[in-house]
């Protein structure tokens, strides 16, 4: 179902998922006079406290989904593992953005890599693994070092294991429960970057400046903007992002993770949602990725992605959130706390953006 006309202030955006991304989407929507209705199964969802309404129910609860659909004007989501049946159920009743095609493509790593490669965009060598024979065939083709990942689910390093020359592929497959998988060749990259792009219902596209990302224990720690890469490399990455978002007939903000290896840009994966590596836009741009996503799904004109400051975004993980008082006192720091009840090890509890004058 398509959105017929732009949604005026006072309309309601439905959001599947109640984590920090939904929370920041709801806060951005409120600035535009739009209401948000959060649908999530967890009672302590951080987004509940900042939304006009919420429904706590399972994603499989069709009665609750039907009521939710009747109370909103458009539906979006904060995470890519929305059950396919849930997306299909809602898409028949209310506009869903991004649509199910993008969702289903990103949910399966083999389909995702096949789609990207089909556009002529470089990806790591890959092969599907479904049984012992296909594992042996994939291993013979890809070799080591390589990474075995579940085809579905998994983020921040979950659902994957590395294979080196002294480690059997069979043991790696056992580590991930012998689930359907993808074997990817290791990319000897120089830097990790991402592209944060938006596309509206009318096909307009806006692409932000490219962040350079640093991970610790498979979890994003910092995003530095501008990325310390050649201008030609950054422009190539932005063009790749535009190609992907257009080919998906996408509506909303997308995060595309990439590797830089020499002069080459290699796409790693797609996240059909606002993205952690785009949090810097909240304070270094006039229009953040969260407002941009709301604008896009509601049929509003896209805002300018222009950056007014250089910035380093740093995630606050686990107990690091207890440093909030010191961070709040720093004049060049913009602090964002997610309101989560428990600071578990590795859990994203907040982030801060450190701004400096724009140099380039």
Regions found by a protein language model. Give the residues of each.
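ATP-binding N-terminal substructure of ATP-dependent carboxylate-amine bond-forming enzymes
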Residues: 1-114, 118, 133
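Residue-level detector of structured alpha->beta connecting loops
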Residues: 33, 72-73, 143, 177, ...
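Active-site nucleotide/adenylate-binding loops and adjacent lid/helix of ATP-dependent enzymes
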Residues: 105-194, 198-217, 221-244, 357-358
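Phosphate-binding core of ATP-grasp and ATP-grasp-like enzymes
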Residues: 175-229, 234-267, 271-279, 291-304, ...
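A conserved FAD-binding loop/helix module that cradles the flavin
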Residues: 281-283
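Short glycine-/aliphatic-rich beta-strand segments at the starts of folded cytosolic domains
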Residues: 307-317
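An anion-binding loop in the catalytic cleft
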Residues: 343-356
